[in-house]
Amino acid sequence: MIHPEGTVMTIYSQFLTRFRALLSLTTVLVTGLAFAHSASAQQDAGEGVEDWVTASMCAVGDRAVDLSQTVSFTYTNVEGNNPRYTSAAQAGLTTADLSDLELAWAIAFPATSSMRAAPVIVGSTIFYSATDASRVFALDTDSGCAKWVYNAGTRLRSSMAYGVIDGEGILVFSDQRGMIHSISAETGEQNWTASGQASNNQGMLTGTPVIHEDRIIVPVSGSGVITGGNPNYECCENHGAVTALNVRTGAKIWEYHTMPAAQYTGMESSTGVKQRGPSGAPIWTTPTIDAARAQIYVTTGENTSHPTTGTSDAIIALDLETGEEKWVFQALANDMWNFGCSAGGPNCIILDDTNSVDYDFGGPAILVEAGDRELLVAGQKSGDIWALDPDSGALVWNQRIGEGTALGGNHWGITTDSERAFMTVNDPGGMGQVSRPGLYSFFLGTGEPSWFYEVESDCEGRDDRLRRCGGLYGFSAAPLTVDGAVITAGLDGRLFVFNADSGEVLFEYDTATDFDTVNGVEGYGGSIDSHSIAAGSGMVFVGSGYGSFSQVSGNVLLAFKPAE
């Protein structure tokens, strides 16, 4: 349903209570597992294919990677300002093209439940990180066959950054051990690996690194949010950080910590376990580069133990050269949450001023021109969208949609064009009148609402293959603006294209089904989430499947082209 005007919702406390009940400890402990297909089904996905990697390869004479062609898509944009916008010329697609798409090919990956990564597209090559399969592929955009394959030897965590260093194209990404990989984009050969973690802080690397000149900027998402669910754990120890590495060697240049190292606080849980803090304020997503101001902007999540800090649920500006903190905008103070809070666990200690709502910033801040000024715009899981002055961090405008949730309102980020900001909202269904899943637009200059589309569940003929079809259908994945269209997708696997000016639905496609694949691996789609939507070289690419949080697993990368 399209609405010509936006509406800023008031806060309904019962919504949060009911949603948190859904996030029981049992649910969160299954993060990362597949639900629509069992583990055995995933293992069987490769049966009948003697070697699924070999079956994916292009003919020997068709494996050359031409890096002299145009870079048409990177997750952060070439400038690193994260606009999630590509022009018609850059993408090779017009709004009219996007209103009539057809499937060109599909490739599947065995033992895979989630398609979480954004690709890099250079000319006729799409570089894709099959994170569950521990591999990076250089795929031909026309056919889907592989020109080369890099085996990292362990699961990967992030999307990829692309840069040209000393005349050579490189790809940079992280793995689940906290290591950064640099490989040749032309051949897939490894240049080096190095730790991306900050000292004395063993955190995950989730967000995409950014290449800027001679440096790689690495976000660190340490927090203890998961281990806090263990009642015997002395919660909590780790915290968010940023490291800067030498792009040629991986040597560390500087590091920034969102807070001091945790110490024993003198507090004990209800079961007598000692508590540590401060902790948390993880940086889940990609830093934003502002070369003109020589600044980096990062967004953070909640604290995971007491004492809380001024850097949680915040947007932070750092000096690009030194990592020194320049300013901090905190959207919500005293948000202390860990997995113990989902089931009233002993490590969830609620004080008088504790919010305990888990309202991270899950997506990056976007640096965008709005008339005669620049703004820094970001969406939050509270359902807020914030616009700041990048010089000082001062608030310019703010709007809020609904109550927000621990897995929404805005989960993985927003997109912009020259006139509007577009925010996806992932409120789950069945939560009463305050559930507002959909796509919302705001005029950049003023923050005034434009149009919004309130998505509704569609279970007819689909509920037998969609887990929780009536509740999981909101828009969680990071949206993308191409020319005059906005591309987004639902946790029920539906892909949507909207007219950016009016909100009219231009195209819809159900990806939650089985697919024939170019490499012979059994392919099936599911929830579309994370950073799984991209466009470039005249095509739209979508990763379908996201098995975390009781969502629908899948293992396919889908390529769409304008219908002939």
Predicted segments with their positions:
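Short loop/turn segments that connect beta-strands within beta-propeller blades
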Residues: 140-143, 184-187, 246-249, 320-322, ...
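Repeat-blade elements of multi-bladed beta-propeller folds
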Residues: 70-80, 112-135, 153-180, 202-234, ...
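Surface-exposed loop and turn segments in beta-propeller and other repeat-based domains
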Residues: 107-109, 195-200, 253-277, 326-356, ...
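Bacterial N-terminal signal peptides that target proteins for export
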Residues: 10-25
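Blade/loop signatures of beta-propeller domains
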Residues: 43-103, 258, 263
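Conserved blade-register residue in beta-propeller folds
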Residues: 138, 182, 244, 317, ...
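Beta-propeller blade signature
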Residues: 238-251, 311-324, 436-447, 554-563
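Bacterial N-terminal signal peptides
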Residues: 22-34
